[in-house]
From Swiss-Prot:
Cysteine-cysteine disulfides: none
Annotated organism of origin: Vibrio atlanticus (strain LGP32)
Pfam families: TPP_enzyme_C, TPP_enzyme_M_2, TPP_enzyme_N
Described purpose of this protein according to its UniProt entry: Catalyzes the thiamine diphosphate-dependent decarboxylation of 2-oxoglutarate and the subsequent addition of the resulting succinic semialdehyde-thiamine pyrophosphate anion to isochorismate to yield 2-succinyl-5-enolpyruvyl-6-hydroxy-3-cyclohexene-1-carboxylate (SEPHCHC).
Subunit structure: Homodimer.
Cofactor note: Binds 1 thiamine pyrophosphate per subunit.
Gene transcribed to yield this protein: menD
EC number(s) stated in the UniProt entry for this protein: 2.2.1.9
Protein family (similarity comment): Belongs to the TPP enzyme family. MenD subfamily.
Keyword Transferase: yes
Protein name: 2-succinyl-5-enolpyruvyl-6-hydroxy-3-cyclohexene-1-carboxylate synthase
Keywords assigned: Magnesium, Manganese, Menaquinone biosynthesis, Metal-binding, Thiamine pyrophosphate, Transferase
Domain of life of the organism encoding this protein: Bacteria
Amino acid sequence: MNHDQAVLNRVWCNTLLEELARSGVEHVCVAPGSRSTPLTLEAEANPKLTLHTHFDERGLGFLALGLAKASNKPVAVIVTSGTAVANLLPATAESGLTREKLILLTSDRPIDLVDCGANQAIQQQGIFSSHVESALNLPSPTTQISLNWLLTSVDNALAKQRNVGGAIHINCPFPEPLYSANSAEMYAEYTSSISGWKSGTACYSQTFLPNQVNTQPIAPSEYLGRKGVVILGSLDIEQATKAQQFATALGWPVFCDPQSGVTSDWKHYDLWMQSDVAKAQLNQCDFILQFGERVVSKRLNHWIKSQASSFCSSQYIVVSPDTHRINQDHLPQTHIVADIESWVSEQHLPTLLGQHAGWAAPLVEIANTVQQLALAQISNNDQLTELSVAVDLSTRLKDRELFVGNSLMVRLVDMLSSISANQVYSNRGASGIDGLVATAAGVVKANQNPLIMLIGDTSLLYDLNSLALFTHNVTPMVIVVTNNDGGAIFDLLPVPEQQKQSLYQMPHGFSFEHAAAQFQLGYAAPETLNGYQTIVEQHFEQGQGTLLVEVKTPPEQAATLLKQFSAMLIEALA
C-alpha cells in the first residue's frame, strides 16, 4: 500500500467527525490554523455539520458554549496547536460548572516534536485538568491502529459526557505533510474493517447507563405538613414552569432566580428580605425545595444557610440533573439527581394538598409594595440609569430572549426585574466577565430568536473582538451596555476606598460608538428612559441585525440610587 500521511490524517478525521455527527453534534466551531487542516477540511465536507468560524480561540470557545446552551446538544470546537488550545480554558472551565457539552478537538504536533524546541508545540495532554469530564489522547494516525479502536474510544468518551455533561478533550497529533491532492480511496483496504459502520447511520458502539434513582428518597407525606419554600435556580422554561406548578399545588411561596426565566407573586425577594417584618414571616419556613442551582441573590443564599443549618437533611431538598455537589455552605441536604419535569410529575400534583397552603401570603403584599415603589421611581422621571434599565426590562422583554451579563447588571436584574416566561441565558458557573459577547452570539446562532443582552462596560471591553460575530447577524438583537466608566460593582463591596478606583474599578474613559462602527453594528446612545425604550422597540419592530445601545451613567450612581431605594423601602415596610 502506498502511504500518504496527509490522506491518512484525513481518513482518521473523517471517521471521528462522522461519529460525532451520528452522536448528535450539529455545530462545529473552527478557528484558523494549519495543523488543524485534517479536522477542518473533513468537518466542512460533512453535510451533517454546520461550521461557525472566529479568529479568536478564546471567543470561539464561548461561541461554542452559547451554541451548546441554546441547542442543548454537544458542540465541537476545532483549533490548531499551541496557545490556541490554552485559549479554550475559560469556556471549558465554565462548561465544567454549568455542564454544557463541549467536544474540544485540539490539533497537536506529534509526540516527537513536543518538549524539544519545535515551533508551536506545547504540552497539550492534560492541559484542561479537572475542568473536562474525560480526555482522550489519540496517537498520530497510523495504519498500525485500526479505525475500530478509534470509534470505540470516541464512543466511550461520548458515553461519559452523555451521562454527566461537561466538556471532553480529544487531542489529535497530526504528523506532516498536512496537505495532499490524493484520494482516500488509497486506504480502502485499511477502512474495510468499518465498512458496515460506513454504510449505516448508527453510532459504532453505544453505552446505556441505568437510572440510579429507582425510588425517590422523599415521599409527599414528608413535606405536605411543612411550611415550605420553593426556590428556582438556573432552569429552562419548561423546567421552571413545571416547578412553579408544584409550588402552586402546595400553596407555597416560590422564589424565582432571573436565570429561571419566570417570576412569582414573591418577586423582588432580594430587596424585601432586608425588612425585619418580612424576615419574621419567612423564618417560619421549615422545608426548602430547590430546583436547579446557582442562585444569584446573596441575601437568599444567606437566608438558606441560616435557615437550613438547623434542618435535617430531609428538610432541604435539591432536585437537579447535575450529579455534582450543589451545596456551597455544606448544609444537611438531600440531593435528588433527576430530570426536574419527571420528578415533579412523579409527585402526582393533582393529589397534593399542603396543610399550610398560603402560609406566606403576607409576603405577597410586601413584594407588591417593592414593585410599586420601583415602578414609581421610573414613572415619576425620565432619567436613564442602570436601575431604570433593570426595572424596565420586564416590559422590554416581551417574547424576546435574554442574555444577562455578570457583575452589577445581573444583581440589579435579580433585585428589580420581574421576568415572565422568557428564556434566560447567562454564564453563572464561574461567573467570569470574559466571553459574554461570544456566548450570546452562540445563543443567537443556535436559536435565531430576538434577544436582548445586558452587559457592563468592562465586560464588553474584555470581549470586544467578539462583536465581529454579529457583523453578519440578521436576527434582531440589542446589546445594552451600561457604561459607568469601570467596575461599578465595587461600589457595593467593602473594598479599600483609597485604592477603589486605581486597583478595582479601573476607569477607562472609553465609549463604544467607534467599536460598533468597526464591526458594522447599529449604534445609539439615548439620554432618557423614554428615548431608550423607543430605540429598542423600533429596532425590534423595524430592523434586523444587531444594535449596540450605550447607556452612559456617572460612576457610583447605581450604588447611590440603590442605597436610597433600599432606605425608602425599609421605611415603607416598617
